[in-house]
């Protein structure tokens, strides 16, 4: 069919010369015009070329100026009309030739189909030539010899055999290619179904409707990580399933948690690796991509939250988040490769004392991120808020704040418990019967949690609230007690840990504690001061004339609290002798000093070391055979 096409050239044919000029003739012309080749150099040729260019430019300018002067508008219009007439003449000539050819064919066909042929004839042809006046006959070709006929049959048979062989080869190649294609497609779809049977979600790619993808990310993550959680499942040449490397993380990453104590790394979390049995399988690659994407989102959210916690001591560097737990201990979080050799630490690790703490923190931040995803899902399923021109702010996830609150709260609770044990150990060594009880995390109440919420979410929600621990302590005098509430809150102001002391001293009802205490030293000073006040009240009540001890021991004197807030008591005997007693209580010891005073010295604050008759007794924590405080008071109270 390609040979039957008719092409009409629109460009004029260029006639070739019948006799092209021979090379000797051209050389002779060059010698006659330019001289011998020996006299030709590059400089002379360049100069000649420049000279010719300048001449041509000058001639063109002169011709242009002359032509512009000679040709006017009328002549230009005449030329345009002439060109138009020539084009019309050529078109008319082509039309006439086409009509002549059509009349010829129509007259020829009028012999057999006159009605159809008459419709395409011109009016002039119908007048001058009757229908069917032109006919055509088939002339039989000259007879061929048997040898020619035999050769023709042989050649045609050879062509047919060759075409049959070529067709057979093409069919075999197509069959083998189809077989390979079926095998590769079968393997591809088997692996796709295996991925689906594992529980992975399969879907079409958004802008590639013919390509399948696997959703390994988390739909409730932030948009930048949610969009990266979809990868294409492509087919290799042999039909193996290939996970598209477009958005899949190339290397595995994990968040490492380290504990630094006194400037030394004392704990490091274990590297988190994928749970796939075969890391090179398609499932192993999907699991690695999911875990790495989760770890990258976790560190991104940690970094994002750390930026708003600079006032609480959280610092960020290029690839690290650091926050303090106490003055001696810090927590470091960074994103590293779990398979690198220097995973444990690039510095020298002195001990592994806090490895359990580091692992617990690593698990906690991952659980908190999953909880944040659950909250995003819960908000997404609720009715949307009213439309507003202001863009809604996406709050930072609570990842660092809960663990910081827990660690700081635990540190302050341990300090307070140690302090109370030391103080009450001193009191018990002095023979004073008193005790205290601690209720850690009294704010966590799982019994009142919302039953519509899963238990895990309810438990996490309890630890996101401000943490509170209560210490209840009994004192020496009846109905005297105090409570210390340790409250830690890092979500809303005021941030940090605060101590609140509730005091019940019947002997000093006007004494109250400050509302909020933020420092250890202040809390320790206030607690020891309250206990010292109760000791002074106990000594005063025991040696008062109404007490049973005073009645049995008539020769003993009574003590009166003159400056109770300074731990000072005064006793006056019948003969007018006066004594002072000073009670000093600290975390490590209880000291009682007695000395004689005269006259107006009873109201003075003299230094005990410079007074006569000074007696001192000290009790420290631990077992002792010395008399107790009340026995010592009874001994020094003898007249």
Swiss-Prot record:
<dbReference type="GO" id="GO:0070847">
    <property type="term" value="C:core mediator complex"/>
</dbReference>
<comment type="subunit">
    <text>Component of the Mediator complex.</text>
</comment>
<dbReference type="GO" id="GO:0006357">
    <property type="term" value="P:regulation of transcription by RNA polymerase II"/>
</dbReference>
<dbReference type="GO" id="GO:0016592">
    <property type="term" value="C:mediator complex"/>
</dbReference>
<dbReference type="Pfam" id="PF10156">
    <property type="entry name" value="Med17"/>
</dbReference>
<keyword id="KW-0539">Nucleus</keyword>
<feature type="coiled-coil region">
    <location>
        <begin position="160"/>
        <end position="187"/>
    </location>
</feature>
<protein>
    <recommendedName>
        <fullName>Mediator of RNA polymerase II transcription subunit 17</fullName>
    </recommendedName>
</protein>
<keyword id="KW-0010">Activator</keyword>
<dbReference type="GO" id="GO:0003712">
    <property type="term" value="F:transcription coregulator activity"/>
</dbReference>
<comment type="function">
    <text>Component of the Mediator complex, a coactivator involved in the regulated transcription of nearly all RNA polymerase II-dependent genes. Mediator functions as a bridge to convey information from gene-specific regulatory proteins to the basal RNA polymerase II transcription machinery. Mediator is recruited to promoters by direct interactions with regulatory proteins and serves as a scaffold for the assembly of a functional preinitiation complex with RNA polymerase II and the general transcription factors.</text>
</comment>
<keyword id="KW-0804">Transcription</keyword>
<keyword id="KW-0805">Transcription regulation</keyword>
<keyword id="KW-0175">Coiled coil</keyword>
<dbReference type="InterPro" id="IPR019313">
    <property type="entry name" value="Mediator_Med17"/>
</dbReference>
<comment type="similarity">
    <text>Belongs to the Mediator complex subunit 17 family.</text>
</comment>
